[in-house]
Amino acid sequence: MTIILGIDPGSRFTGYGVIKQEKQRFTYLGSGCIKAMSQGEDLASRLQTIFAGVSELIIQFKPDMFAIEQVFMGVNPGGALKLGQARGAAIVAATNSGLTIAEYSARQIKQAVVGTGAADKNQVQHMVKSILKLPGTPQADAADALAVALCHGHSHTSAAILAGQATKIVRGRLR
C-alpha cells in the first residue's frame, strides 16, 4: 500500500489530493484547497500559508510519495514566476519531511487520467470522479491535484512493471 499526495500549485489556491494505491487500485483519502489569500495579499504571506498547509497535510496523511504539477509557461510570465514560487513552497515542505519529489507536466497528467493530453478541466474532473468512485464532482483545483496523484500512481506502477520485466530479460526469462 502506498499513499500519494498530489499538489496542483497556485499562488492563491493550491489544490491537494491524497490517494491510497494498492497494486493498480486507487482509493480516495482526501482533497481540497489551501487558500493562500486568507493570510493577506502579499506573496510572502501566501507562500508561508502554502508551506504550512502542505506541511500539515504531510503530518495528517503521512504520504509515501509526493507529486506536483510543473509550471506551464503561458502568456503571463509574472504569473508563471508566482506559480514557480508556490511550487517551491510546497516542494520545500515535502523535502523537509524526507519525501522524494515527482514532477509531471499538465499534458502528462491529462494523458494518464483522461487518455489525451489535450483534455479540458471538465474531462479531468469527470475522470477523477469516475476512477476514484467519488459521490460528487471535486472542485477544479482538488480534482487537478487528485489527477496529479493518479498520474504518479500510474507512472510508478508502470515503472515497477518495466523494472520487473527488465530483470527477467537480464535473466533470460521473459516470454
Swiss-Prot record:
CDD domains given in the database record: RuvC (cd16962)
EC annotation from Swiss-Prot or TrEMBL: 3.1.21.10
The organism's place on the tree of life at top rank: Bacteria
Biological processes, Gene Ontology terms: DNA recombination; DNA repair
One GO location term (cellular component): Holliday junction resolvase complex
Requisite cofactors: Mg(2+)
Alphabetical list of SUPFAM superfamilies matching this protein: Ribonuclease H-like
Name used for this protein in its record: Crossover junction endodeoxyribonuclease RuvC
Signal sequence range: none
Species the sequence originates in: Colwellia psychrerythraea (strain 34H / ATCC BAA-681) (Vibrio psychroerythus)
Keyword Metal-binding: yes
Annotated PANTHER family: CROSSOVER JUNCTION ENDODEOXYRIBONUCLEASE RUVC
Annotated binding of Mg(2+) 2, by residue: E69
